[in-house]
């Protein structure tokens, strides 16, 4: 799967050293872009134009609709006091999957200015257990867990244009990274009976 993804990325985005298998790794220096080369600290257009087809990934595709409906919780941890809802079939027949699930979840927008795409929709499970389909109430007989999707992102980091250890103000280097993004929740058997 990784090979297929990397096949259509620009050469500058696919920098990977060959596996070392006991040999020392040679680390190539990433290009350091000056403030003049970047528009307001954004990634260079040539890295974004042939991007990793981000708009097709669920965490990216959901952002616009979440922003339109006002679901804006940025870079925070799980909600304090989140309660597992009571499932009432008559109330959720027309609802979205995440609201009808016996392991319901909500989405929030995570924003990271040093990541491209900067905004991602991430799922948060609403229950520790799962909802019993007969009673509509949470049961601890099952556990809600996040479903994770791997997503290739572009990271920016401060860099030095003059070769010193101190970063040059407004200058950045960019590298790719796979992250795991929660896209939903599902029910599983508990790992133990404790």
Curated annotation (Swiss-Prot):
Annotated tissue distribution: Expressed by epithelial cells after bacterial challenge. Low expression, if any, in lymphocytes.
Pfam families tied to this protein: IL17 (PF06083)
GO MF annotations in UniProt: cytokine activity
InterPro entries per the UniProt record, alphabetical: Cystine-knot_cytokine, IL-17_chr, IL-17_fam
Gene: Il17c
Keyword Signal set for record: yes
Listed GO biological process terms: inflammatory response; neutrophil differentiation; positive regulation of cytokine production involved in inflammatory response
Protein name in UniProt: Interleukin-17C
Keyword Disulfide bond part of the UniProt annotation: yes
Disulfide pairings: 125-185, 130-187
Keyword annotations from UniProtKB, A to Z: Cytokine, Disulfide bond, Inflammatory response, Secreted, Signal
Gene Ontology CC annotations of this record: extracellular space
Subunit and partners: Binds to a heterodimer formed by IL17RA and IL17RE.
Subcellular compartments: Secreted
Domain of life: Eukaryota
Function: Cytokine that plays a crucial role in innate immunity of the epithelium, including to intestinal bacterial pathogens, in an autocrine manner. Stimulates the production of antibacterial peptides and pro-inflammatory molecules for host defense by signaling through the NFKB and MAPK pathways. Acts synergically with IL22, TNF and IL1B in inducing antibacterial peptides. May have protective function by maintaining epithelial homeostasis after an inflammatory challenge, such as that caused in the intestine by dextran sulfate sodium in a colitis model.
Organism: Mus musculus
Factors inducing expression: Up-regulated in the colon, but not in spleen or liver, during infection with Citrobacter rodentium. Up-regulated by various inflammatory cytokines, including TNF, IL1B, IL17A and IL17F in colon epithelial cells.
Similarity comment text for this entry: Belongs to the IL-17 family.
């Amino acid at each position: 799967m990784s090979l297929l993804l990397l096949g259509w990325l620009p050469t500058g985005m696919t920098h990977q050293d060959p596996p070392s298998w006991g040999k020392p790794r040679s680390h190539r220096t990433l290009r350091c872009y000056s403030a003049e080369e970047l528009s307001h600290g954004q990634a260079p257009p040539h890295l974004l134009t042939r991007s990793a087809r981000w708009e097709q990934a669920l965490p990216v595709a959901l952002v616009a609709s979440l922003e339109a409906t006002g679901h804006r919780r940025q870079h925070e941890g799980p909600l304090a006091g989140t309660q597992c809802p009571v499932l009432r079939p008559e109330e959720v027949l027309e609802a979205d999957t995440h609201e009808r699930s016996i392991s319901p979840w909500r989405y929030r927008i995570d924003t990271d200015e040093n990541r491209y795409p900067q905004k991602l929709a991430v799922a948060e499970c609403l229950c520790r257990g799962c909802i019993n389909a007969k009673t509509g109430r949470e049961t601890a007989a099952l556990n809600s867990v996040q479903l994770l999707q791997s997503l290739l992102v572009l990271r920016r980091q401060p860099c030095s244009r003059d070769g010193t250890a101190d970063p040059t103000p407004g200058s950045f280097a960019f590298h790719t990274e796979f992250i795991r993004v929660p896209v939903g929740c599902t029910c599983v058997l508990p790992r133990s009976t404790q």
